[in-house]
């Protein structure tokens, strides 16, 4: 399987867990994403994936994270107070409930699919704890 097929298959499997329709997947140049460090983005037209990134755990984590955002949108999670990464500093951004939830869900997926447990070492302990608590809640729900 090539990268496109692998990503589509993974997105379908994760979407089935979330009980959402698998969004379209497009590979795009990095300039079409919000930042140069972004790997994957959820748009109204589907998921955009950087075309210059290889098949890595980070790619799968990012796809699962964005699919959780798609789930949040479909299930009317409040976006009223949500701010994008260019509107807040990185710690404030990651502490938002929707980001905590998406990170926790992606961590559960990584553990279930690949036996990998993301540590979030680039985040403060307070945010890691929020993710850990939410991760345990999600594990009970699945």
Where are these regions (language model features)?
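Zn2+-dependent metallopeptidase catalytic core
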Residues: 2-22
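Subset of outer-membrane beta-barrel
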Residues: 26-30
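Short, exposed beta-strand/loop patches in secreted or surface proteins that constitute
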Residues: 37-42
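Catalytic glutamate of the conserved HExxH
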Residues: 62, 66-74
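Substrate-binding/catalytic groove segments of enzymes
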Residues: 71-82, 111-120
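Long, well-structured alpha-helical subdomains associated
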Residues: 92-95, 106-142
């Amino acid at each position: 399987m090539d990268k496109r097929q692998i990503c589509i298959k993974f997105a379908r499997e994760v979407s089935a867990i979330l009980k959402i329709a698998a969004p379209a997947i497009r590979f795009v140049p990095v300039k079409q994403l919000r930042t140069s460090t972004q790997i994957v983005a959820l748009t109204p037209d589907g998921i955009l994936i950087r075309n210059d990134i290889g098949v890595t755990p980070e790619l799968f984590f990012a796809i699962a994270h964005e699919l959780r955002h798609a789930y949040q949108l479909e299930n009317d999670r409040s976006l009223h107070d949500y701010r994008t990464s260019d509107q807040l500093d990185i710690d404030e951004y990651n502490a938002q409930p929707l980001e905590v939830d998406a990170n926790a869900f992606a961590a559960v997926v990584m553990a279930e699919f690949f036996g990998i447990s993301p540590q979030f070492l680039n985040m403060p302990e307070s945010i890691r704890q929020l993710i850990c608590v939410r991760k345990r809640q999600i594990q009970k729900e699945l």
